[in-house]
C-alpha cells in the first residue's frame, strides 16, 4: 500500500494520488485529490466524475457460451460436478482486460478429471485474464469439456432476454463496468471569501483497470461529451430583434463573429457583452462605470464621449477601434451627431 501526505497548493489547480493499494488480483483501490477549488466546484466535479466512472468506462466480459451437448441452461452433464447454470455464473465472474473493439471468440477444451480454471481459456492475443485462478468447473470423470465463448467489450449492463437463446448457445448477463465503486468527499478550508475546497475521489476497480487508468478514462469521456458545445453550428448563434438576447461565449466571440460578418448575417448588438472581447480589464472597468455593458451601448457613444470617462486614454480608444474593425468591420464616430 502506498500513502502520501496530503499537501494543498494555494496556486495552480492540481491532482495527486494520495493512496494506492492492491487488495487482491480483482480489487484495486486508489484515492485522489484535486485542489484548490472554489466553493461549489468540488461537488460539481465529484458528481460528474462518479457518474462517468460508474457508467461511461468500457469493460470486457464473456457474453455467450456455445455447446451443442447442453440441452438447456439448468441441465447437468455427467462427469461435471457443477450444473450448466453454475458454470455460466462462474464464467460471468471472469475478469478480462483488453483493447478489443466489438466482439471476439474464445474457447475452452480440457480433458478430465481435473479442475477447469480461467487459465484454460484460449483467448485472442489482444485479450488477457486478470486472475488465472478463477474457478469454472470440476471434471470428475475422464470426459472432454469443450465449449466456445463470445467475448464483448461494451459499457454498462447486458441483460439476457428470451430471444437471445439459440440452439446450443447461452447468453450470460454481463456487467461491463470495471469500476466496482466510486465515492467523493469534500474538505473545505479558509475563511470568509477566501474559502476553498479539496475534492477527494475514491475508486475501487476489478483489476482490469487501475484506479488511475479509470480516472483518466472517465475524464476523457467527460471531455468528449462537452466537445460538441465548442463546435456549435453558426445557425444556432443568429438572433432576431424580437428574441431574448443571450451573451455569446468567449470562443464564439473570437471564432465565429468574423464569419458571421462575411456572411452578412445580422447580429443583435445588444446581446454581445464587452467583457467577452479582448479589452483589458482596466478599459472594461472604465466602461462599466459609465454604464456601457454591450456592444450596442458602446456604439451609442462617440470617441469624444469615451474620452470624457475618468482615467480613459487615447490608447484605450485605439484598442477599442482595433477590435471593432477586426471583428465587426465597423467604426466608432469621433463626435456626437
Swiss-Prot record:
Enzyme class: transferase
Cell compartment(s), UniProt: Plastid, Chloroplast
InterPro entries: DNA-dir_RNA_pol_insert, DNA-dir_RNA_pol_RpoA/D/Rpb3, DNA-dir_RpoA, RBP11-like, RNAP_asu_C, RNApol_insert_sf
Entry's Gene Ontology BP terms: DNA-templated transcription
Gene3D superfamilies: 5' to 3' exonuclease, C-terminal subdomain, DNA-directed RNA polymerase, insert domain, RNA polymerase, RBP11-like subunit
Single GO MF annotation: protein dimerization activity
Region feature Alpha C-terminal domain (alpha-CTD), mapped onto this chain: 265-337
Domain of life: Eukaryota
EC number(s) recorded for this UniProt protein: 2.7.7.6
Major site of localization recorded for this protein: plastid
SUPFAM superfamilies to which the protein is assigned, alphabetical: C-terminal domain of RNA polymerase alpha subunit, Insert subdomain of RNA polymerase alpha subunit, RBP11-like subunits of RNA polymerase
CC annotations in GO: chloroplast; DNA-directed RNA polymerase complex; mitochondrion
Region ranges (Alpha N-terminal domain (alpha-NTD)): 1-233
A Pfam family annotated for this UniProt entry: RNA_pol_A_bac
Function: DNA-dependent RNA polymerase catalyzes the transcription of DNA into RNA using the four ribonucleoside triphosphates as substrates.
NCBIfam families: rpoA
Subunit-level organization: In plastids the minimal PEP RNA polymerase catalytic core is composed of four subunits: alpha, beta, beta', and beta''. When a (nuclear-encoded) sigma factor is associated with the core the holoenzyme is formed, which can initiate transcription.
Domain comment, as recorded: The N-terminal domain is essential for RNAP assembly and basal transcription, whereas the C-terminal domain is involved in interaction with transcriptional regulators and with upstream promoter elements.
Name used for this protein in its record: DNA-directed RNA polymerase subunit alpha
Lineage, top ranks: Eukaryota, Viridiplantae, Streptophyta, Embryophyta, Tracheophyta
Gene that this sequence comes from: rpoA
